[in-house]
Every structure is written in structure tokens, then in C-alpha cells.
Amino acid sequence: MSVQPLDGVVSSVPEISYEGTDLESMSFALNYHRWILELFAPYMGSRLVEVGAGTGSFSELILERTPESLTLVEPSREMYAHLDARARAWAARADVETRNSIFPAVAEEVSTKRRPDSIIYVNVLEHIPDDEAELRAVQRALPQGGRVFVFVPAFQWLYGGFDRRVAHVRRYTRPELEAKCSAAGFKVLKSVYFDFAGVAPWWVKYRLLKFDSMEPGLVKLYDRCVVPFVKVAERIVPPPLGKNILLVAEKG
């Protein structure tokens, strides 16, 4: 394994300071994250990039699938410190490198050196003001047939206090996300709403009652008691709407 923090690269990138405490509450949602990865897995290659890797919760699940290489990109200084430390602990498991940067700033270097065939954005694209430029950068970094994997929050009418607190720029609809991927030069292979059961609780808590935080205890409870059943139900009947959208698209 090689772990390569690219300190020289980020000097030309605006420094981002974000501890990620609220978002990392989702690190307790193990079943939820495994569900996402299971839906991605049939389309994934072996040379992977995860953008907005945070402190590495989803990255660790990716490594269970023994990829040929994994490149982890995280712009937050605080979160990157934890991510890089964890990556060093994964030394015997895979070829892992880290970048403390936004993806467009390292896209060319990562494309040339790491030759990724799959680039993953889990709960990241909604934070990026110019998401269309981001998708174009991903498209340029991938070879023909390379794929982008996107998981984002759905429906602007669910946008509430938590979204504002964690700096979500937007929530998406499937047609909107599909159109943006198509405009960037991708062909959509899979696009589904995800977690139908989470829609009503989310609306009540964050829109109606105006809460702005996510409690780890409730995340664990939902993950253990609800997610396994919702996962089975949505495998049988694709939901007409959901709290999130999962999309896979291929560079044509």
C-alpha cells in the first residue's frame, strides 16, 4: 500500500475548514451504507476514487471488496487528518492514496497516475455549488466506459434545518440529476429513489419541527430496526419517491 498525502497540490486550492461532526453521525449507519454499496457494486470497477471521503467510514466498506486501488479525496483539513491516519492503518489491505483537496484541483493528476475506472460521490455532490462543473471534471478524468457513482438527498421540499447546517446547496430530483449527468457526457445506467420510509420522518423532524442536528442514537435505531426491512421492500418494488437518489452513469 502507498499512502500519499499531496500537500503540495492543495496550496493552490482554497483551504476548507469543516469538522464534519453532524455528517459523521451517519458513520453509525452501517446497514445503510452497506445497502448503498451493494447497489453500486455490480457496476464498480477495480480502480476507485472516493470524493468527499470524510473520515473514511464508507471507504472502509469499499476496501472490504478488495479493489486494485483506492484514492480518497477530502478537502476539509480536520476530516482529512483523521482520514489519512486511517488510510495508513489500512496498509496491508490495498493500494490506498489520499488527497487533501477538492477533486477538480487533482483530477488530472489522479487520472494520469491512478487511472480510475470508478469515481464515487456519497452525500457529497449536494455540497458543491457548481455541481455541473464537478461532473464535467469527473467525466474528463475517466476513460471511455468509466463510471460515476452518485448518492444524494432528494426533493427540495425536504430541505430543512439539517441541510442548512451542513451546507447543502440543494436536494435533487431524479430527472434533474439525470439531466446534469447527461449534459456532462454520461449515459445513465441506473437511477432510483432510495429509502422511501425515511421521507415522512425526515419531513416531520427537519421541516415541520425544524430540528437541525442528527442524533447518533436515532441513526443507530433506524439503521438496525428499519433499514433491513426497507431494503427488502425496495428490492421487490422500486419506490416512487425516496429520501435519497442513487445513480450510476457511464462515460460514453
Functional labels for PLM-detected ranges:
Residues 122-125, 151:
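Residues lining the SAM
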Residues 132-147:
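A short glycine-rich, Lys/Arg-flanked "PGG" loop and its adjoining helix->strand segment in the class I
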Residues 57, 79, 156-158, 197:
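Feature marks short, surface-exposed loop/turn motifs that line or immediately flank catalytic pockets
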Residues 21, 148-170, 174-182, 204:
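Short, glycine-/aromatic-enriched active-site segment of Class I SAM-dependent methyltransferases
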Residues 186-197:
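Conserved S-adenosyl-L-methionine
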Residues 1-122, 133-135, 240-245:
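Conserved N-terminal segment of class I S-adenosyl-L-methionine
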Residues 6, 12, 27, 109-112, ...:
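A C-terminal cap/extension of S-adenosyl-L-methionine-dependent methyltransferases
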